[in-house]
Amino acid sequence: MATKKDPLGVQPKPITGSRTSLPRTHEIKARALAATRLLEDGWVEHDPQRAIIDDLIDYRDQTIGRLGNPLSGRRLSQFSQAGKSKTMAQLKAELAALRVALGLPPNPYQVVIVELDRRLNLKGFYQEVLRKLDDDFWDADVSAKVLENRIADFVRKLDVELLIADEVQHLRRKANDANEVTDRLKVFLDRGIVPLVLVGDEDSVPFFRANGKLAARLGNPLELAPLNPKGSVADAKLFKKFCGALDEGLMKNRIFPSSSMLTSNKTLDALLEVSSGHVGRVARLLSVAAPAAVRRGAACVEPYDLSRATREFAIGAGWLVTDPFSIAAP
């Protein structure tokens, strides 16, 4: 009986380690966890993300001492898993470090990040902001206007410098509650309640286009565009530098004893195809592949692990429909 061909091609075979996971020893579990934390929570310096952080720090500086006056906001739209949320987390960490460097006490409320939900109405949005501000009465049965005024009071009392609303694409839906939240975001800026940064995926672009009055208050859009190594030498260098930094981090943190050769031309080409040039997606793919490589006792992340991660994660996430780490079936 003929063997059925794999439509994605012939997968590479493991070079080191086992094909499947080994018994979970303490050492294996510790290294797999370290790999996950490094790749999901760690920061790799990347020029386009640095530019966004610098722009938002400038925005913070421009708005200090201006509460109660009309404020502009900022917005960032880019594909899912492109690195937006990690950039916002790094912004928060760097502003906290700047505060300490100035001799000021730490302020956990300096930057407040709220993730919007597709079901969130205006009152729910306000309550989520107040919950992040540790308001004991965030869920009190009061009007949205009262909640809005409480937010203004808490922002001043807690010295909030930025409010970041993530996943704003959920406001794109055609519903009264979504429109109400959108209208009040404009009021947030007009009243100078708090400096506001709106972050969303590619679906947020039509939302901003359809809400011109809000978009006009948000200045020039911040861009975290995908790299184009095939068409730009500078982008090729940035992409290789980022992948190399991930490889170095895996060795420096003693997760693997050997290089994963992420900067070889063949691997770079495959990573580019999987990620479409979004470095955040490269890190996300590695966050799936690296722990799996640890668990099977491999000396590094191999094409076998990257192929499995592509098939089991990236294709399912809708990033692509092929596996560039596999060899096309004859």
Where are each of the predicted segments found?
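Walker A/P-loop-proximal flanking segment of P-loop NTPase domains
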Residues: 1-73
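Walker A/P-loop nucleotide-binding motif
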Residues: 68-90
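Conserved catalytic segments around the Walker B and adjacent sensor/switch elements
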Residues: 99-117
